[in-house]
């Protein structure tokens, strides 16, 4: 009798542990074996996270204000590099007729390319997820919301390729990262514009550094040396005196620099610094594109399983080129590539 009562109590305990939960994707009621904060619907495939998430509207307001301030500073700095650079190098670079026309064409081309790509990256929507029908069982078919989650901030479905940006306050499709310098996210709709901005900005900074260095050498005051008598001095002392006098002569010439000269020095230092930063960022972005990943996917745990398809086709697909790379390769190279792929398949 005691064994029967204990068995009945066990069944009652199991029954009371089961609880009902509603799937946000299709609206079906699910019977879960235990209280779980995260579960997946067997019909539509949607993932439900019942943990409470709050939206910090005050923090969102301050983040947007900070992004706009940084964006304004970047715009002013870019305009200063363009117009200030033209004014500083004008007597040396643009005064000669042929070279003036040549450098004017290069300056206008780089300026238009950089400003336009920056504007598309900053003021264009980074990527809007597609609108889906959800919440009702008859309209949601089997597997329509596979691995979708519900964004409590936007109150709509979020695909595995979508991430919610708390700085922008919305979900971004294929989000790579939030860039404070453009005041916007880098996603599916403006990622190519962002790469174009990095490329045009890199070439612009290289051009500015070369032109400012060339103009700076022409406007720099001549160095005056006062080494004095060198008879009776050893070679080591003579070398030290020459180095020291060169440094002092350079510092004395800096005091004689005009306003144009100081601007040229600043342009050279600023352009070289930005060239280094843009080169590193462009290399990182192209490497992620080649590996078929984004910055956020690299940070996630799923990106470290080593199953990524590293191929130039990822680069071609990213830039939207309609044809395969093999179409433009010589026939024997394309054949060798196909044989190599088949060989790897047989090995697997």
Annotate the PLM regions.
Residues 1-348:
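Membrane-associated feature with strongest affinity for ZDHHC
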């Amino acid at each position: 009798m005691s064994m029967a009562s204990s068995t009945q109590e066990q069944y009652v305990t199991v029954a009371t542990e089961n609880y009902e939960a509603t799937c946000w994707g299709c609206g079906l009621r699910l019977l879960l074996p235990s209280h779980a904060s995260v579960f997946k619907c067997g019909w539509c495939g949607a993932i439900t996270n019942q943990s409470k998430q709050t939206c910090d509207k005050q923090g969102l307001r301050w983040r947007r204000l900070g992004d706009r301030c940084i964006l304004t500073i970047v715009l002013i700095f870019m305009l200063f590099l363009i117009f200030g650079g033209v004014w500083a190098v004008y007597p040396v670079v643009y005064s000669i007729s042929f070279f003036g026309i040549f450098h004017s064409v290069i300056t206008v081309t780089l300026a238009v390319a950089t400003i336009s790509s920056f504007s598309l990256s900053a003021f264009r929507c980074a990527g809007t997820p597609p609108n889906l029908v959800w919440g009702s069982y008859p309209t949601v078919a089997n597997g329509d919301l596979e691995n979708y989650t519900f964004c409590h901030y936007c109150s709509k479905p979020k695909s595995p390729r979508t991430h919610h940006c708390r700085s922008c306050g919305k979900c971004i499709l294929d989000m790579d990262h939030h860039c404070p310098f453009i005041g916007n996210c880098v996603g599916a709709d403006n990622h190519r514009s962002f790469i174009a901005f990095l490329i045009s900005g890199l070439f612009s900074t290289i051009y500015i550094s070369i032109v400012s260095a060339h103009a700076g050498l022409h406007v720099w005051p001549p160095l005056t040396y006062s080494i004095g008598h060198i008879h009776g001095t050893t070679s080591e002392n003579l070398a030290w005196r020459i180095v020291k006098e060169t440094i002092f002569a350079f510092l004395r010439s800096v005091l004689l620099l005009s306003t144009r000269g100081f601007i040229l020095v600043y342009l050279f230092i600023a352009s070289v610094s930005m060239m280094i930063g843009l080169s590193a960022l462009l290399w990182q972005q192209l490497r992620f594109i080649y590996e078929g990943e984004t910055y956020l996917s690299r940070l996630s745990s799923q990106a470290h399983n080593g199953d990524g398809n590293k191929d130039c086709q990822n680069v071609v697909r990213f830039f939207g080129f309609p044809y395969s790379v093999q179409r433009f390769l010589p026939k024997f190279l394309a054949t060798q590539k196909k044989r190599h792929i088949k060989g790897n398949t047989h090995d697997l």
